[in-house]
Each structure stands twice: as C-alpha cells, then as structure tokens.
Swiss-Prot record:
Cellular compartments annotated: Secreted
Chief localisation class: secreted
Gene3D superfamilies per UniProt: Mannose-Binding Protein A, subunit A (3.10.100.10)
Domain of life: Eukaryota
The keyword Secreted belongs to this UniProt entry's keyword annotation: yes
Gene Ontology CC entries for this record: extracellular region
GO molecular function, one term: toxin activity
Annotated C-type lectin domain residues: 9-40
Tissue distribution: Expressed by the venom gland.
Stored SUPFAM superfamilies: C-type lectin-like
Protein name: Snaclec tokaracetin subunit beta
C-alpha cells in the first residue's frame, strides 16, 4: 500500500512534489519522504 497522497502504478508508489531542486537534493528529499523511496 502507498502512503496517503501517493499514487500507485505497477506495484510502485509515486508522488509529485512542486519544490524545485537539483538532482542530488531531490534524491535526498525523496529518500526522506518514505522508506525505500528514490527519485524516479
């Protein structure tokens, strides 16, 4: 199951964030949002 405010697709969870940041900061931010999360 995906966290609230996340979408499920092909057994994975996705969420769009509106904050603009570089790839490194975005990956760090993403991994902090949910265990096992990575920037796609």
């Amino acid at each position: 199951d995906c966290p609230s405010d996340w979408s499920s697709y092909d057994e994975h969870c996705y969420r769009v964030f509106q904050q603009k940041m570089n790839w490194e900061d975005a990956e760090k931010f993403c991994t902090q949002q949910h265990k096992g999360x990575h920037l796609x």
